[in-house]
Amino acid sequence: MDTMYWKDNTLFLLDQTKLPIEVKYVKLKTYEEVAEAIVSMKVRGAPAIGAAAAYGMVLGVMGYRNDQNLEVYLKNVYETLKNTRPTAVNLFWALDRMWKKYLEVKNQTFEEIANALLNEANSIFYEDIELNKKIGAYGLEVVPENASILTHCNAGALATAGYGTALGVVRAAFEAGKLRKVFADETRPLLQGARLTAFELLEDGIDVTLICDNMAGYVMSLGLVDLVVVGADRVTANGDVANKIGTYSLAILAKEHGIPFYVAAPYSTIDLNLTSGQDIPIEERNPDEVRKIGDRLIAPPQVKVFNPAFDVTPAKYITGIITDRGIVRPPYKENIKKLFGGK
């Protein structure tokens, strides 16, 4: 199923807060609605957020009225979308790309500007699918025969324009006949592993076993995991990785058990402007996400909650970063620079 699609000047977005109980698409006609969908995690996953924000810019220009300067108006659209979530760098990458396109065509007619922005958003969307397939192809190199892969959160088709990053590697292994099974962490507090990854893999006929987050170490100790593959929301210049909370713990467990730990992400997730993971802003979300599952209270309503959405895994715990341009291995600072043509 599609994470999102564009039709009749409307962004149709799969509401991932309803999965797996209900498959429902919401119709978004304004950039404000796109911003709300990102904040509320109707759409989530770094590449998917970027693509949605790009279409949000298109909806922004389509909602323009002649009562103010177009550039001032569009800058406000840009800032509104940019301020939705602070950690996933693909959001800023996609918005910067859309803004650059606007600056290229700003002297053209309004209709030409709108068409140029729509074409750019479409390019971001369809390019992401191709990037993910390349990630899958490169990742296949590190997957042993008859592999059992553990993954965290959801870095699949639902988190991207299609195919997935970490699950792109899983899909490539499945298609090549190299995959035995997948262990999916449930991923508290919003259960993306249980609700989304398990759902997505079952839809594809892939053998998946769901485990609680705190079972991962024991599963590894039993020799049931050959490698760990996760996605990323931001990779810094030194190879540190911000990803869904709980990733850091998995990386330490994998290292303790001698299990390769790979991160799968497109080049757009790498932020060369940040020297290390200490520079990454970590989003802290509503405490009720921990106090409740759905609408049901599972903890005392007055209890204090710490709810960071992401953690940072230091590069020393990462075996390799699987990108659409190849697999980056240590030393990361040097080899990430090479990935972008630097020396």
UniProtKB/Swiss-Prot annotation:
Keyword Protein biosynthesis set for record: no
Active site: D233
Residues bound to substrate: R44, G45, A46, R85, Q192, N243, K244
GO molecular function: S-methyl-5-thioribose-1-phosphate isomerase activity
Recorded catalytic activity of this chain's protein: 5-(methylsulfanyl)-alpha-D-ribose 1-phosphate = 5-(methylsulfanyl)-D-ribulose 1-phosphate
UniProt pathway: Amino-acid biosynthesis; L-methionine biosynthesis via salvage pathway; L-methionine from S-methyl-5-thio-alpha-D-ribose 1-phosphate: step 1/6
Record-marked site positions (Transition state stabilizer): C153
First-level EC class: isomerase
Keywords: Amino-acid biosynthesis, Isomerase, Methionine biosynthesis
Biological-process GO terms, alphabetical: L-methionine salvage from methylthioadenosine
EC number: 5.3.1.23
SUPFAM superfamilies: NagB/RpiA/CoA transferase-like
Keyword NAD tagged: no
NCBIfam families on file: eIF-2B_rel, PRK05720.1, salvage_mtnA
Family label: Belongs to the eIF-2B alpha/beta/delta subunits family. MtnA subfamily.
Function: Catalyzes the interconversion of methylthioribose-1-phosphate (MTR-1-P) into methylthioribulose-1-phosphate (MTRu-1-P).
Annotated protein name in UniProt: Methylthioribose-1-phosphate isomerase
UniProt organism field: Carboxydothermus hydrogenoformans (strain ATCC BAA-161 / DSM 6008 / Z-2901)
